[in-house]
Amino acid sequence: MSNRTIASYGTTQQLRSFERRFGYTSHVSPRPQIREGQDKRDVGRYSIPEAAGYLAVPARTMRRWFLGERRLFNPSYRRGGDVLLSFNDVTEAYIIEVLRNHYDFSPIKLRRIVEALRVRSNLDKPLAQREFYAIPEFQSFVDRRVIRGQQTNIDLAHHGNLVFDQFVAALGKRVQRDRRGHACRLYPWKESDSDESPLSMDPDVLSGELVVSGTRIPATMLYAKKLAGKTAAQIARSYHLKPALIRKVLNHFEREKP
């Protein structure tokens, strides 16, 4: 969404508030072109502050994960001072955020798991390119694969031991995957331990912008209207949505998690 569109909703002060929330500036990073045969999920599309706003993760945390001295991930696009994250980058960050905030994985354990997965899978972005599940009871991370024709789970946090499917709590309610196990849609939601999915991101819907699930309505547009003084009921009437859904969408942006 352009700053000009946002500006039409409110005052200059409200525009600046919106820009701060999503890191929008007058400088526009050049968007990389999709190369022949390249998966669109690997193409840089989001600035770090923008991705942080979409995931309700503090921007400083996202910068540390992608640009810090001991970073967890490498951004898909980096040219000089321009850094853009791909859909796969955002997927990996969201999985780490869910494990960190809702399953209490320590930073040391998360780093050990990410590094082990890269080595064992031989993939650049294994969290996005393989199907994984969280196991809250054992504070473990599990790589789901087929062994001797039977689908099993390998507990990477406990030295490769096998664990049973009945103990596996699916992270899959937040990360939808295609038949190859690649992430194809995210349902980022601040209350990720809830079964609700009011928001989604899909590379085939508005180029991966955060939208109200089941629609092509950008969530940032609703937030801009809220900053301009519109109530949830007024916004709901404009888009023929329920006020309760609008309130959930707006709450996603209201406060950052620690």
Annotated model-derived regions:
Residues 49, 115, 233:
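Residues within the helices of the helix-turn-helix
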Residues 18-37, 196-217:
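Short, Lys/Arg-enriched anionic-surface-contact patches
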Residues 143-204, 208:
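Hydrophobic packing positions characteristic
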Residues 215-258:
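Long, charge-rich, low-complexity alpha-helical segments
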